[in-house]
Amino acid sequence: KENADPQRTAFLLRKQWALYSVTPLYRFSNAHLRAYARLLSAFIAAEKQKGLAVEVGVELDIKVAVSSLPDLRGSEQDQAAILVQLSLRSSTSKKKSEEKLVWSGCFCCVFGDDLSEKIPQDFTCLPLFLTNGAESYTSIVGSWFQKTFDCSFRRLAISPLNLSWMAAMWTGCKVDKLTTATELVFSVSCLPQPLDISYAIHPEDAKALWDTVQKTPGEITQEEVDVFMDCLYSHFHRHFKIHLSATKLVKVSTAIASAHCDGIIKFLQSQYLTGVLMLLTELAISHIQ
């Protein structure tokens, strides 16, 4: 079910987002977002004074905006997503047009019933945190949230097993124009020099293969994912005599999204945004529990 308003969620598309899991926030309230923005702004200014996030040259102010995104959730049970944006503006300029967005962070929960049903009333469940921008800002914002809401953040890596699921799921999605190749990147670590192998598959061929493997449309099993990957491996071996099963899958790129094992994601299709976020919410929850 894709119910996110494309206009309200367009900011997520075609950018690289780093993924984190976040434990539930204690006594967080949607009614106090403006106060949170003020407090976070003061905290960043204090950290800047300590020299932790100094911009060289012009004296720059950091403007903090904290807003709610009710469109970005899977069901009524989910907490509305929270967007934190940091913009830089020269302290000599008062024009809004001269503000430059330098960092965004989005807390969200898409079909996170597994966790939200189990947590006490004073806690807010937003287990997935996406960031775009300098890590120095991520760490300052993260430490303010940790101090204020007694939560903890961890980088969310994506295992080769989960990447293979993404490859299969996204390959099977219907897209108006199949122009983007499905690309899998494998890492060979046993060599003196690390080597990456890129395996590009024509999107129509990849979809045709998945359609022969998938037994029940709309449902995916581990066995189907294994068969899909094995078919790709044996095809590659036939042509290049390389056993991809002995390497590590590190990146998947499709028309829907691309994902890297280090926990980096890029969303490419607004119509599948909710579906991808649902999968990432599930990974974040399993990371916390």
List the predicted regions and their residue ranges.
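Core residues of folded domains in eukaryotic genome-function proteins
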Residues: 58-62, 78-84, 103-104, 124-129, ...
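Amphipathic alpha-helical protein-protein interaction segments
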Residues: 124, 130, 134-135, 199, ...
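C-terminal, charged interaction/regulatory segments at domain termini
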Residues: 225-289
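Charged, low-complexity surface segments at secondary-structure and domain boundaries
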Residues: 17-30, 126, 149-151, 213-216
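N-terminal low-complexity/intrinsically disordered pre-sequences and tails
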Residues: 1-117, 264-289
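Terminal interaction module
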Residues: 150-251
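Internal, hydrophobic cores of structured domains that mediate oligomerization or house catalytic pockets
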Residues: 88-170
